[in-house]
Amino acid sequence: MGIEGVLDKGFVTTSLDSLINWGRTGSMWPMTFGLACCAVEMMQTGASRYDLDRFGIVFRPSPRQSDVMIVAGTLCNKMAPALRKVYDQMAEPRWVISMGSCANGGGYYHYSYSVVRGCDRIVPVDIYVPGCPPTAEALLYGIIQLQNKIKRTNTIAR
């Protein structure tokens, strides 16, 4: 957090932007949107070995309780409207992590008639995590990159 100054009486001064962004990075609640084998790696990231709870990250089942969506796996044309509907139900500010080659660009099924060639055609994506399937460490790195991106944003319009 960008502490601007510490005064004699024990007060700390900082900007409101850095305080709000610090709170947002410390309490990200992702919603799982597991569509294929990448979801298994996403579950492993939330388990005891990597323990996302230490970062304040708690998986939520409802889009109304989440601010991060992790799209993991192959997105088919039939599932695309459901993805958009769930994204629209999330409260602002909201972020999207695209996990795996299939979610990033269609992956192995890129030339199939029924596969969306990247979930960024349906929802805006903030972080892309490559791999087929990406490891739990790669997803953890993507989450940390999203936290860094949130820290750099301006919250209050000037």
UniProtKB/Swiss-Prot annotation:
[4Fe-4S] cluster binds at C37, C38, C102, C132. Binds 1 [4Fe-4S] cluster. It is a peripheral membrane protein. GO terms for biological process: aerobic respiration; electron transport coupled proton transport. One of its GO terms (molecular function) is iron ion binding. It holds the Pfam family Oxidored_q6. Its EC number is 7.1.1.-. It is found in: Cell inner membrane. GO terms for cellular component: plasma membrane; respiratory chain complex I. InterPro entries: NADH_UbQ_OxRdtase-like_20kDa (IPR006137), NADH_UQ_OxRdtase_20Kd_su (IPR006138). Keywords: 4Fe-4S, Cell inner membrane, Cell membrane, Iron, Iron-sulfur, Membrane, Metal-binding, NAD, Quinone, Translocase, Transport, Ubiquinone. Gene3D superfamilies: 3.40.50.12280. It catalyses: a quinone + NADH + 5 H(+)(in) = a quinol + NAD(+) + 4 H(+)(out). It is an enzyme of class 7 (translocase). NDH-1 shuttles electrons from NADH, via FMN and iron-sulfur (Fe-S) centers, to quinones in the respiratory chain. Couples the redox reaction to proton translocation (for every two electrons transferred, four hydrogen ions are translocated across the cytoplasmic membrane), and thus conserves the redox energy in a proton gradient. NDH-1 is composed of 14 different subunits. Subunits NuoB, C, D, E, F, and G constitute the peripheral sector of the complex. NCBIfam families: nuoB_fam, PRK06411.1. Belongs to the complex I 20 kDa subunit family. This is NADH-quinone oxidoreductase subunit B. It comes from Nitrosomonas europaea (strain ATCC 19718 / CIP 103999 / KCTC 2705 / NBRC 14298). The gene is nuoB.
